[in-house]
């Protein structure tokens, strides 16, 4: 199922992070959140019953590249106070996916009516943060130029398992000229809490990707003859893991539709 197309009225383009969340809550923004609240960290989401929370936290600790945890809710709570004022996990993301027994059964605008007292929400760092640093350095982002979602692919790179959780890493791809790819490695290495440096450059078949024109998530992008594909670990990995591990119930964000936080990208830079 594809995420809804971006709907962003012109008067939303300069909203604060809090105002952008409220606009999502009101249904005024759907689809991708790329470019909203510039300078603020956006987060992927995974929500699981509390009996699975410890195992998932251990899974994330063992796999920090695809699953860098930046916030965890208390059981039943729809807020993660350290991530934002008046932040509601169940309503403030423009697209959610509902999973039952490893199957994605529904995509919806909010999950307030599905929330339970035993659910724990995990906010996971998102590559939109390091994309902002790449743009500031003058590096091109093809998916932004084309107005589409970044392409994402399941790979043959195994995640380290924990309890019932395991499965393949998902990566996002950005085509760059070789010199720009080297610079991208330098820039994104500063942001380990939001996936950090790439996990692979070139040769997509070496990590199990057969056709770059057919991403598993997101949208395909043009790749120039003088460019190479550069792959970063991706926060959609929990969705691949949920499909493989088949928990009875889970909620995630829809790919490209993120939780906009009050935290600044600069807070997550290490140098």
Curated annotation (Swiss-Prot):
Protein keywords: Lyase
Taxonomy of the source species? Bacteria, Pseudomonadati, Pseudomonadota, Alphaproteobacteria, Hyphomicrobiales
User: What HAMAP family does the entry give?
Assistant: Hydro_lyase
Q: Name one GO molecular function term.
A: lyase activity
Q: Which PANTHER family match?
A: D-GLUTAMATE CYCLASE, MITOCHONDRIAL (PTHR32022:SF10)
EC number of the protein: 4.2.1.-
Q: What is this protein called?
A: Putative hydro-lyase Mnod_1097
Q: Which superkingdom, per the lineage?
A: Bacteria
Cysteines paired by S-S bonds: none
Matching SUPFAM superfamilies: PSTPO5379-like
Q: Which Pfam families match?
A: D-Glu_cyclase (PF07286)
Q: According to its UniProt record, which protein family does this protein belong to?
A: Belongs to the D-glutamate cyclase family.
């Amino acid at each position: 199922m594809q995420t809804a197309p971006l709907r962003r009225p012109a008067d939303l383009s300069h909203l604060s992070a809090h105002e952008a969340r409220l606009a999502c809550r009101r249904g005024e923004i759907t689809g991708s959140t790329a470019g909203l609240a510039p300078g603020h960290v956006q987060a992927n989401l995974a929500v699981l019953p509390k009996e699975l929370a410890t195992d998932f936290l251990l899974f994330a600790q063992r796999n920090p590249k695809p699953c860098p945890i930046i916030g965890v809710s208390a059981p039943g709570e729809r807020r993660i106070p350290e991530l934002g004022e008046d932040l509601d996990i169940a309503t403030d993301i423009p697209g959610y996916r509902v999973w039952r027994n490893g199957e994605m059964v529904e995509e919806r605008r909010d999950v307030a009516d599905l929330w339970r007292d035993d659910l724990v929400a995990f906010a996971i760092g998102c590559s939109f943060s390091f994309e902002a640093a790449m743009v500031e350095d003058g590096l091109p982002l093809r998916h932004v130029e084309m107005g589409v979602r970044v392409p994402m692919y399941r790979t043959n790179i195994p995640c380290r398992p924990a309890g019932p959780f395991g499965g393949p890493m998902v990566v996002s791809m950005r085509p760059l000229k070789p010199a720009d790819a080297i610079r991208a490695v330098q820039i994104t290495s500063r942001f380990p809490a939001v996936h950090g440096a790439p996990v692979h450059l070139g040769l997509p078949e070496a990590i199990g990707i057969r056709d770059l024109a057919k991403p598993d998530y997101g949208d395909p992008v043009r790749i120039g003859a003088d460019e190479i594909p550069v792959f970063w670990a991706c926060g959609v990995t929990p969705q691949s893991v949920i499909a493989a591990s088949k928990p009875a119930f889970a909620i995630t964000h829809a790919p490209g539709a993120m939780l906009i936080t009050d935290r600044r990208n600069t807070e997550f830079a290490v140098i």
